[in-house]
């Protein structure tokens, strides 16, 4: 599910978060499509593993942090966001937590984000949706996910699949949580 997990930094962030913020201290997972300052954004691929680290958080990550969200880590995804199944040939395919007895796909391309939320590891999973990359894994993992209006959240700092169709969005376990995150 997680390609990078930074529990120590998350604990420090949580301790420093103001309790009055809407996401105060809640764990946030970030799809490996979004820039996080100091980290490489590889879009689920090994080709970009040696790319330069991001100089700043993308606007979506910055907004979640400003709302008190604590970045737990960077999640697995379909390579270059180019499938709705959720498989990644380099990092493995996260198992759909709805039925762990049988290895079922979680849907994609935001597969790791969905699994992180469905297992309770994260309150919200930041992802993207071009042709179903939030809606498909949300449906397969029993979560809430929708494709918001284009540009409702800036796409700068996100690896593009389609610059005219990409949207930034998140998955949660309830509609109430989705409203809190998207406000």
Question: Language model features by range: what are they?
Answer:
Residues 87, 115-183:
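Fold-level recognition of mixed alpha/beta catalytic cores in primary-metabolism enzymes, strongest
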Residues 1-130:
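Gly/Ser-rich catalytic/binding loops embedded in alpha/beta enzyme cores
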